[in-house]
Amino acid sequence: MPKHGKKYTEMSKKIDKQARYDFNEALELSLASSYVKFDETVDIAVRLGVDPRHADQMVRGTVALPNGLGKEVKVLVFAKGEKEKEALDAGADFIADEETVAKIKDGWFGFDKAIATPDMMGTVGKLGRVLGPRGLMPNAKTGTVTFDVAKAVEELKAGKIDFRVEKAGIIHVPVGKVSFGPEKLVENVKAFINMIIALKPASSKGTYLKTITVSTTMGPGVKIDPMFTK
């Protein structure tokens, strides 16, 4: 395991590793432990009491963060005809024409999210091997396969995120930037946690929210007491 630098070690001393904090305390500590010059992303990792190997315990969904992500989200749309104009008017950065599709096949990924109208899924399917591993494959379950492309583009631009529990039972997502300050970050974190709770599988037994940890890109993790979500 690589050793952390002096600054990381110094900041870690501010945090009681055995303690479980409420939302406000956790975010304030996390921001106070930021020691780099750039505007770090704030992430949250939630370990759930589920077994993702079972389909009825898969936790997956989307949530619109009240204060967005604090970064520009570049959106690519697979559409044709009037839906192209609708997507561009809503703020889409790219329309996947034949030239763009060829660029993607050659390894171009200058976008963060992809949306497709249902009638374009034949084209999208041919790119599954390159889009899928990067989490860029449009999916009806996350609202990115739809004829309402304007709404989908606007939501992604505003900070809508999609998430899915990993094999280890952990969901890890960004919830904003250090520059947001504690108040806006708390609002984003609560919106995300409330959605996770709402998606609790009926087959999940025992403790559902096992651990919740927030951290900045380079900073140490701060644990939130799951009891504060009730």
UniProtKB/Swiss-Prot annotation:
Listed InterPro entries: Ribosom_uL1_bac-type, Ribosomal_uL1, Ribosomal_uL1-like, Ribosomal_uL1/biogenesis, Ribosomal_uL1_3-a/b-sand, Ribosomal_uL1_CS
Stored SUPFAM superfamilies: Ribosomal protein L1
GO CC, any one term: large ribosomal subunit
Keyword set, alphabetical order = Repressor, Ribonucleoprotein, Ribosomal protein, RNA-binding, rRNA-binding, Translation regulation, tRNA-binding
Q: Does the keyword rRNA-binding apply?
A: yes
Has the keyword RNA-binding been applied to this entry?
yes
Pfam families the UniProt entry points to:
Ribosomal_L1
* GO terms, biological process: regulation of translation; translation
- Could you tell me which cysteines form disulfide bridges? none
Which GO molecular function entries does the Swiss-Prot or TrEMBL record give? rRNA binding; structural constituent of ribosome; tRNA binding
Q: Which CDD domains match?
A: Ribosomal_L1
Family of this protein: Belongs to the universal ribosomal protein uL1 family.
Q: What does this protein do?
A: Binds directly to 23S rRNA. The L1 stalk is quite mobile in the ribosome, and is involved in E site tRNA release. Protein L1 is also a translational repressor protein, it controls the translation of the L11 operon by binding to its mRNA.
Concerning NCBIfam families, the annotation shows: rplA_bact
SUBUNIT field: Part of the 50S ribosomal subunit.
Q: From the Swiss-Prot or TrEMBL record, give the protein name.
A: Large ribosomal subunit protein uL1
